């Protein structure tokens, strides 16, 4: 049987919520392979099905991305263990998220973070536009639902189309990567800087430039 370290047992316990001794035995029986150990625990009915749901993603890394010295992003992406935080797949995910923020310029991570005042203002604007277009009063609220979805796609990171594959949203991409990694993954917060932001100057579409670069990657 393979030698099983205390750290390995700790990592498997955090993944499965199974007991320490069960985790140790699973790793020993699986030759130290985490995927096989998890499968062993599931077959024995030891791994807790609800374990992942109740766990907190409190580890992770701070990722950064700078495009041509003109757009900079700092983003915090969380996972459940420091073991995964060191995983190349997780670090690649963080890089992709940072580049998405640079290219698409979201204002919030998810729609629950959008202030009510912002939503009310956007609804008023869209409602007035629809009225000027002669849309029937009875249809306004229904049309507004679609308009607000478009608004969320513009300002919320997880609702945006992924710049590397516009057939899926960023939230879907993150969920797919999280499933592959085997842990809960969550974007907590980010900051995006653009050179000269707030200063009146010649219009340069830096976001489009970043998106073009990503498309060539």
UniProtKB/Swiss-Prot annotation:
GO terms for cellular component: cytoplasm. Signal peptide: none annotated. InterPro entries: EF-Ts_dimer_sf, Transl_elong_EFTs/EF1B, Transl_elong_EFTs/EF1B_dimer, Transl_elong_Ts_CS, UBA-like_sf. The keyword DNA-binding does not apply. Associates with the EF-Tu.GDP complex and induces the exchange of GDP to GTP. It remains bound to the aminoacyl-tRNA.EF-Tu.GTP complex up to the GTP hydrolysis stage on the ribosome. Residues 81-84 are annotated as: Involved in Mg(2+) ion dislocation from EF-Tu. This is Elongation factor Ts. It holds the Pfam family EF_TS. GO terms for molecular function: translation elongation factor activity.
């Amino acid at each position: 049987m393979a030698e099983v370290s205390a750290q390995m047992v700790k990592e498997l316990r955090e993944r499965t919520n199974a007991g320490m001794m069960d985790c140790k035995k699973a790793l020993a029986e699986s030759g130290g392979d985490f995927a096989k150990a998890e499968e062993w625990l599931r077959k024995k009915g030891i791994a807790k099905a609800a374990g992942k749901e109740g766990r907190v993603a409190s580890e992770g890394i701070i990722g950064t991305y700078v495009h041509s010295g003109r757009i900079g992003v700092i983003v915090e992406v969380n996972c459940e263990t420091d073991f995964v935080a060191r995983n190349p797949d997780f670090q690649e995910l963080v890089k992709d998220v940072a580049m998405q923020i640079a290219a698409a310029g979201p204002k919030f991570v998810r729609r629950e973070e959008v202030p009510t005042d912002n939503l009310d203002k956007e609804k008023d604007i869209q409602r007035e536009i629809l009225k000027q277009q002669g849309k029937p009063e009875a249809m306004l609220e229904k049309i507004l639902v679609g308009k607000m979805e478009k608004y969320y796609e513009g300002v919320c990171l997880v609702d945006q189309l992924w710049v590397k594959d516009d057939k899926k949203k960023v939230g879907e991409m993150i969920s797919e990567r999280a499933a592959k990694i085997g842990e809960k993954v969550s974007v907590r917060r980010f900051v995006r800087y653009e050179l000269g932001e707030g200063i009146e100057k010649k219009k340069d579409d830096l976001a489009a430039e970043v998106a073009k670069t990503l498309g060539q990657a």
